[in-house]
Structures are given as structure tokens and as C-alpha cells.
Amino acid sequence: MDIKKVTGVYFSPAGSTKTVVETTVDELARLFKAECRYISLNTPSDRAQEYQFAPDELVVFGCPVYAGRLPNKISPDFARCLHGEGTPAVALVTYGGRAYDNALAEMCELLTKNNFKPAAGGAFLCRHVFSDKLAAGRPDAADLSELRMLAQDAALKLRNGGEI
């Protein structure tokens, strides 16, 4: 698969999910020798826009988990504003130490319904948004290294034409 652009799309009210997405996008862009860009969905005005993604673009979508789910008040906005064209995707969820339950599967389902083709996914521990003590310092250097390895595995899979 010939990837021309890698786009990071994130909802990251506390900043950790943005770090996870940026690390992954930067590695994928390096591996594919592709340009990269970032789209924040943090504000209602960000989510009011419609975003269309081409088949030769790779989208890395990241979102935090709340009570084991994608944010229920904002997920409908994601479903409305993100549109693929058979676009490959990497699904990333972040959580603060309790559990991510079915959030990763939920994200893959959302992406698939919007004409994306999930090729890889992962759940990553980040500092809990309500406490500096839960998962303090996460994502750390080891987490960022794991993200780069995930990106390398995803790139290899995409080059070989695979999806989840």
C-alpha cells in the first residue's frame, strides 16, 4: 500500500492522548516517507467541521476512555465528522489505569462504519485525568517506544495489504 499522508486525529482534553497520537504519526510518516498533519477534535468548533480522508492516507485516531467507553457525549460527533474512503486507520485509546474495557473495539467499529479500514490498534496507559498519582508520568519513555513498535508493525502489515 502506497501511503502519501499520515494524519493524526485526536480528542485529548488533558494532552496525553495527543502525545500518544503524535508519537505514532511521526513514526509512521518516517517509515512511509509521507507528509503528516494533525487534527484536533478538542473543541465543539473542531468537531463541527467535516473531515474526508483519501484511500492513500493513513489516519491515526486517538481518544481517551471514560468508564471503559469512548466519551458518550462526543462519540456521535466523531461518527458525524470523520469520513474515510476505504482509508486505512490505526485506532488508539488511552486510559488512566482502571480499564479500557471495550473502548478499542468500539473505536474500530466507529471507524469501520465510517469507511475506514482499521489495520492496527492499541490501548495505552496515561496519567489519570483526575489524579496526579494514578499512572503518574505516563506515557513514559517505555510507552513511547511501544508506540513506535506498534507503528512499525502497522506499517509492515499495511505494506503487505493487511487489515485487522
In which residue ranges do the predicted regions lie?
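FMN-binding flavodoxin-like domain, especially the glycine-rich phosphate-binding loop
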Residues: 1-20, 25-44, 49-164
